[in-house]
Amino acid sequence: MEAKIVKVSDSSYKDGLGKKRKHPGNYTPYDSGRSYAKLQWVLSPNSSTQKLEKRRNLDGENKVIVSENHVEKSLVRYFSYYKKTGVPKRVMFHENGEWIDLPDHILCDIRNDLEAKRATIEFNWCGRHFLLDFLHMYRLDLETGVKTQLAWIDIAGKCFFPETFDTLERDGCHHIRGEDPEQHDQREIKLHIEIDVNSGELPRLNLNVVTDESGDNMDDFQAVQRSSNGPNDEASEDSCSRELDDAVEKWDKTETDRFSGVKPAEEELDKDAVKQMFALGAATLGHVESLDVYQFSSEIAKARLSLFQKQADITKKHRGDANIRYAWVPAKKEVLSAVMMHGLGVGGAFIKKSMYGVGVHAANCPYFSARYCDIDDNGVRHMVLCRVIMGNMEPLRGDNTQYFTGGEEYDNGVDDVESPKHYLIWNMNMNTHIYPEFVVSFKLSIPNAEGNILPTTQSRHESSGLTLEGPKGSPSNEPGRVSNGGSGSEKNSSSSRRPRSPIMPFPLLFKAISSKIARKDMDLIIAGYQELREKKVSRKEFYKTLSMIVGDDDLLISTITGLQRSLG
């Protein structure tokens, strides 16, 4: 049977907010020679319900004007989408006629909520407070009340886009600007989604944006259908709807279950699932050149798993819930073989001191742990994916000398009980509450492994001598260099005679200061650095942000000076 493709076309206009980003280009459209049905959805700006009418064009094309309570049916459909979707690996919102990706560090922050399938999730971004409503498929700015359409692509590559963009964004602009929606000049953006509803292959997305400069508003809500089902228009429409529903149901029964992100830690993972977890949580690191996953499967590993499960039963009996989670621990290549035999307690190699205390430090997201990985001679980094019994989690208060629980009611510590990113397993628990299960070895491509470099700059921070902005045309004005300013006499000398510091990668500076500032501040710095890499902020703005977050210019100067000496 010839596969049928359904093409959905949605409409919207440009609202003038946010930054633009090009559509992803890694989806392959279907061959144009295959038969397909085309549904074009355009919502009238001044009508909430429509009358049903059927008419036939001279060219034989069937046109059906659909009558339905569009909002209610859309909500039911969105709820169906939300229940069937896997864990989102990309979340997008619609602004300025473009689909813009939510940054990866934000996805890391809300990862637990995404896995829990929460219908609404709050988050902060660039100093503003937003809410994601997956049920109604919009993003809400909690300060201005502006709503923008929401879409996502789950871990299996399934795409979930709203039916229509028109009324929601127009209402948002009307709310802010006080403009009449009927008179608002809009640009039509058509989003074509092609789905193979018969074949068993994964659906492929073809994003084709068409801009209509005329700005004419459509006066009716139409579903235009071209089908090979024959002259029976109503039957064609019902058949197409059923096929779409069956296709969505088919996703839920097969692929979505297999690829739905992070499974509960009580369940077993395979290598493919671990790779998916890593790809979801470490995308911000850059392009991964190679990725290998090794699972501990020896008899000793099985015995350790048995002991771990017994400890989980004990914790569950006393606490009501063992609270088992997956956690990522950075590791050195030299200790990996010993970890297979003795766990993370081998030789104290994993016991570290940080602002939270002394113990085994782990993270809920590979992005945070990967930044602390050592790089071997081949440029490869290693992490251990562990199951961890967290039990009752103690909120850590920043006492870097703490090495055991603050009370009998606690088992291990976290940075935030509500949404933990950083786990601290105390020394007394590291052999009983941690089960190392996989080793993930990865290598980043050279530009990302080295990181972007700060440019040498001219204007100085008066108290620190840390250069911030360099003269135009100076030979040191290269991307990504950090330099320590010279003496006052050097300031007045020509740029050609000014001494230059060696190149210093950003990640090297971040690693050096990470143990000297609060973890939440370090996360803010990394988030700002990601915005710099995405060219959402200028270098000068990032330098100011870095200085404000650290709050101690002497610390930056001494750290940079020490790193320069080590670089020789």
UniProtKB/Swiss-Prot annotation:
This is Probable inactive poly [ADP-ribose] polymerase SRO1. Keywords: Developmental protein, Nucleus, Stress response. Residues 497-568 form the RST domain. It comes from Arabidopsis thaliana. One of its GO terms (cellular component) is nuclear matrix. Interacts with DREB2A, DREB2B, DREB2C and NAC082. The keyword Glycoprotein does not apply. Its main location: nucleus. Disruption phenotype: No visible phenotype under normal growth condition. Pfam families: PARP, RST, WWE_5. Gene3D superfamilies: 3.90.228.10. Induction: By salt stress. The gene is SRO1. Residues 245-463 form the PARP catalytic domain. Probable inactive ADP-ribosyltransferase that functions with RCD1 to regulate oxidative stress, hormonal and developmental responses. May regulate some stress-responsive genes. Seems to play a smaller developmental role than R. GO terms for molecular function: NAD+ poly-ADP-ribosyltransferase activity. Residues 1-32, 220-241, 453-500 are annotated as: Disordered. Expressed in young developing tissues, such as young leaves and flowers and root tips. In mature plants, expressed in vasculature of leaves and roots. It is found in: Nucleus matrix. It comes from the Eukaryota. Coiled coil: none annotated.
